[in-house]
Amino acid sequence: MSSSESPKDGKPSSKPFSLSLSGSGSNGRSRKSAFNIPPARAAEPPSRTLARRPHRLHDDESDEEEAPPAFEDVAGFDTHTGTVLSADGRAVDKEKRELVIPVTSKNNWRDRVRANRGTRGKNLLPKEVQAMQEAERRGETAENDQETDRPSMSYGLSFAKPSQGEETKPGEDQAMKDAGPLKPQVVDERKPLTQDEIALQALIRESKGETEGRTDLVIESAKREVDESYPVRLDETGSFRVDVASRPEPATLDQYNAIPVEEFGAALLRGMGWKEGQSIGRGKYGTSATDYRSQSPRIPERRPGFLGIGAKDVSGGKGAEAELGAWGRAAMRKGARKAETQGGEGNTQGVYMPVLMRNKKTGEYITEEELTALKKEGKAKKGDDDWRERRDRNLEKSGRMDILVAETITTMTAIGLTDGGRVLHGETEVCHPVIDSPGGESTTMKTAAGETTVIIATEIETETGAIVSGIKIETGIGIERGVVTGAADIGMMIGIARDIHPLMRLAGTDVIETAIETLNGEDMMINVSENAGQCFGLDRT
């Protein structure tokens, strides 16, 4: 131990009193501790030109000796940053300390409201039992424990026990007890009033101006015994006084300046148990049960459409709208299971409400499932049924079955051969089915410019009627290998053309002629309505 240097020129030294201790540790190295006491009053800041030499009790000559401890003069603390300031004004602690404002729970307004509501009921147990319970809570044993006599319970066959009085021998007189004095029977002096007396009293009260009947009956209220466990009810004035009395002392100006404005909210949250990295406003901080929820951010979900304020989405899906009438959870689960078994989406929830459709012709009501089944059956039958049978059936319905008996076209003129096929041109009132030409040649039907054009359509058969979608072939559109090309409406010629609508006369056009070609081995049925003017048909001629 050494003291500071002697004062020079009559001035006290600014170097503080220091104490250094050293000892051997477990690893062979010396451990040192230094205590530094700053001077009570420094006249001037110490000079940095002279090197400081630490003072120790003894020196250790080991090569692995740690560096001597550095002495720091602490002059105070920074109220803004919370760091330690040395005697020369430098900050010793570089790291910034976290500010925490603890929140005390002494002034809890919920406890006062709960006391006023009287949620805690009165203890109805006997006082002896309450005293025993209180002694057990304090860890004491209740004195003068008395066993209460209770009737013994026996099960099975039981026999009556003989009386324990004095046994009398046969032939002796038995002692008889004298009967006590008779107690007089209490008789109610009040007699019930007769109807005449009641009417007389009513007249007397009416003459005195008493409109309401009075009675001398008294209902006594049960007097409430003083119970310390019962909370004291507080009114607004008492609650305000308790609130003011339980408030902490106001903060000083230095404490107010020590906390920066931008860290005030975080300091309050740290006092409530919040830590860095946790989300704000969800769960209880520091608990293991809500640790995951506290760390995960809360993302607000978008409300479903047409959902009113305060209403809840009963469907359960994200953004799903509840169907009107779907109020029961059991019905929703039933609808979801039914939708999953029928091949639909399993997450569909809601009450199953089938939509009925009415056929205009037959008046029959069918559901969507039945309509889907009928469409599937129609598609299956369409592939199996022969087109000739459908042709005969349609012609029989329209009354034009006799058209097929014609053998030749009314007028048919051979214009020439194109690509080895037969080019035919003519005018007729009926159009016969196109059959493969003799010799396996392709057939081509040409229409001169300004004469006629052909509209070909396909027919889809249903149980309720025919749905026709047309393909229009105009002048200047070529048909190559059964495929319409160069037109806005493209359709397939390969197969069966079920219907040909009335021909339309073309206006003046620059196109010379158009051709409709039927390849070898293909069949085309041409059916003309009553308003048909001119059309063209190909036959085996």
Curated annotation (Swiss-Prot):
It is found in: Nucleus. The keyword Nucleus applies. Belongs to the SPP2 family. Its main location: nucleus. One of its GO terms (molecular function) is nucleic acid binding. One of its GO terms (cellular component) is spliceosomal complex. Residues 287-297 have a biased composition (Polar residues). Associated with the spliceosome. Residues 1-12, 164-176 have a biased composition (Basic and acidic residues). Residues 1-90, 111-181, 285-312 are annotated as: Disordered. Residues 261-307 form the G-patch domain. The gene is spp2. This is Pre-mRNA-splicing factor spp2. Involved in spliceosome maturation and the first step of pre-mRNA splicing. Residues 13-28 have a biased composition (Low complexity). It comes from Aspergillus fumigatus (strain ATCC MYA-4609 / CBS 101355 / FGSC A1100 / Af293). Pfam families: G-patch_2. Keywords: mRNA processing, mRNA splicing, Nucleus, Spliceosome. GO terms for biological process: mRNA splicing, via spliceosome.
